[in-house]
UniProtKB/Swiss-Prot annotation:
Keywords: Cytoplasm, NAD, Oxidoreductase, Plant defense, Stress response. GO terms for molecular function: glycerol-3-phosphate dehydrogenase (NAD+) activity; NAD binding. This is Glycerol-3-phosphate dehydrogenase [NAD(+)] At3g07690, cytosolic. It comes from the Eukaryota. Gene3D superfamilies: N-(1-d-carboxylethyl)-l-norvaline Dehydrogenase, domain 2, NAD(P)-binding Rossmann-like Domain.
């Protein structure tokens, strides 16, 4: 499949406005009706994504409105307030901005313990709770979900996969009277599994479709090799927006900036599934890096085995999935190198975090790889999926052919083993050459389209 490059030159204000006018025209907006863009969920990437849109288009107030929803009532502890105060005072421009907005005093009071700050309150000033050290531009924050989304034209899903269905099911109540369906761009990198009436993977875009009834052509996925803080700091980055041609092409042009390159691609499923899989294997990558003292050799061996398992799993779900190359491979690489899931694996291996602490970590947010490990392994270990092994001639489940996934499940979910066991799995002398698993994948022997709700 060909990716279509969106032009990347630095864009003058006049051309930015022209791009805004173009997407308004595509969406059928009247001259006196602003384009309403709403972020749902305020994790690091969701907040950065909305902040970039606000910085790029927010100055055209009569033509566009950008806002973000997050739950209210999340109090910030004193240690975080102290750290936030240090960040503010270390940056003169930020300090001046808060003073101009008459917002500095509350941070002084919170530092002294004289008042409590809330996550939605500091987000208005540009501070994402999961990314305190990377201040964003000020944002319009709404804590009432109905107020946030009822008239939205473009919705950015920044929720974890574990919360997507629940929140969009609530949103569906506010869209019943709508004439025109909104366009939804999901940033969620995770999957869930269900087992009745038959085993299947459910991706975030499918959850949104189920919850809201919004046509699938109006639901897209955007992902790429991006670390949220680096993207906001204008490190050169790229992404793919995947879905129907009707929307991915105009939205690709609308979303691009001089430092943020957007390609469009039709293969939504592979990119979305890979978005979940890379988080799975990133946890193991963090463990391996720590346990081997950053051994390049060990990390490369792990990379070879985990990417072969990823290729195998995507070929279970799609007959001709996008190849693990280019941006897809780069996305996997950066997530294994520096994503929050890799960080989580490192902290577990160092003993600085424990599984008893759960998968929602202060200052980092939801570690989506944990639920994805459970979803993928339990789905692929169903006896109903067993097939004859092409070489050994005995029935095996797909999970049995994925030893890294299996060991991550036994470390993170059933807790049978400590983190050190990931090295035992990696160094197992009976482990096959990764090429063999890739050849099995390309044989389509295990292709089972119903795993994604498709007809055989």
């Amino acid at each position: 499949m060909m990716d279509h490059l969106v032009e990347t030159n630095s864009v003058p204000s006049r051309l930015v406005e022209e791009r805004l006018d173009e997407i308004r025209r595509v969406m059928g907006k009247a001259d006196d009706d602003p384009l309403r863009i709403v972020g749902v969920g305020a994790g690091a990437w969701g907040s950065v994504f909305i902040a970039m849109l606000q910085e790029n288009y927010g100055k055209f107030r009569g033509k566009v409105s950008v806002r973000i929803w997050r739950r209210g009532g999340r109090a910030i502890d004193k240690a975080t307030a102290e750290h936030l105060f240090e960040v503010i005072n270390s940056r003169e421009e930020l300090l001046r901005r808060l003073i101009r907005r008459c917002a500095y005093l509350k941070y002084v009071e919170a530092r002294l313990g004289d008042r409590v700050l809330y996550a939605d309150e500091i987000l208005k000033d540009g501070f994402c709770l999961n990314m305190i050290e990377t201040p964003l531009c000020p944002l319009k924050v709404v804590t009432n979900l109905q107020e946030a989304v009822w008239d939205a034209d473009i919705v950015i899903n920044g929720l974890p996969s574990t919360e997507t269905f629940q929140v969009f099911n609530e949103i569906s109540k506010y869209w019943k009277e709508r004439v025109n369906a909104p366009v939804i761009i999901s940033l969620a990198k995770g999957v869930e599994a269900e087992f009745e009436p038959h085993p299947r993977i459910v991706t975030p875009t499918q959850m949104i479709h189920r919850a809201t009834g919004i046509p699938l052509e109006n639901i897209l996925y955007l992902g790429g090799p991006n670390i949220a803080s680096e993207v906001y700091n204008k490190e050169y980055a790229n992404a793919r927006i995947c879905g129907s041609e009707k929307w991915r092409k105009p939205l690709g042009k609308f979303l691009r900036q001089s430092h943020f390159i957007v390609w469009d691609n039709s293969d939504l499923i592979t990119h979305e599934v890979m978005g979940g899989l890379k988080n799975v294997y990133a946890i193991g990558a963090g463990m391996v890096a720590t346990l081997t003292k950053e051994s390049a050799t060990s990390k490369s061996v792990y990379f070879a085995h985990c990417t072969s398992e990823m290729i195998f799993i995507t070929h279970l779900l799609a007959k001709e999935p996008e190849k693990l190359a280019g941006p897809l491979l780069a996305d996997t690489y950066v997530t294994l190198l520096k994503g929050r899931n890799a960080w989580y694996g490192q902290k577990l291996a160092k003993g600085e975090l424990s599984l008893e602490m759960g998968d929602s970590i202060k200052g980092k947010g939801m570690i989506q790889g944990v639920s994805a490990v459970k979803a993928f392994f339990e789905l692929l270990n169903q006896s109903s999926l067993s097939l004859q092994h092409p070489e050994e001639g005995k029935p095996v489940t797909p999970a049995e052919l994925c030893p890294i996934l299996k060991m991550l499940y036994r470390i993170l979910i059933t807790r049978e083993f400590s983190c050190e066991a990931i090295l035992e799995a990696l160094r197992d002398e009976t482990m096959n050459d990764p090429r063999e698993l890739i050849e099995i994948a390309h044989s389509h022997l295990f292709f089972q389209p119903w795993l994604l709700g498709q007809k055989p």
